[in-house]
């Protein structure tokens, strides 16, 4: 993918629950649920692909169904998906509960896997080749500082 845009960073599962009425703390609340791939790097890669750019995505994922869901969504958009898979970990996720007007009630960001995406991971052969094969790199600033500076 010579001259592609390389996007490096977060690609995870976003979950949003939206309540049908006012929040009743400490009780079950009726509402709707939406689950889809997201994350800063994933969303940027999707938008670049929609604009017609050749895009390669490198992001840490777990060896689970959620990681496969992110990969499948990227591939549907024509993104060259190159996940760094941690087989013994879960793919990161963000879960938000929203009031009926869209305001956030509470959220859970399960993003610990991103902290394991160290500069050493960038030295893997396939990642090095991807970095060498591109002129433009977009990097998610939520990655560890040592990874970004590498």
Spans of model-derived segments:
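Ribokinase/PfkB-type carbohydrate-kinase core domain
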Residues: 1-11, 56, 73-86, 98-150
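Glycine-rich phosphate/adenosyl-contacting loop at the front of the ribokinase-like
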Residues: 1-60, 65-75, 106-107, 145
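Generic intrinsically disordered, low-complexity segments enriched for polar/acidic and small residues
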Residues: 39, 91, 111-114
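Short, basic and Ser/Thr-rich N-terminal targeting/leader segments
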Residues: 51, 77, 89-92
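Residue-level "edge-of-site" marker
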Residues: 61, 86-87
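C-terminal catalytic lobe of FAD-dependent flavoproteins
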Residues: 95
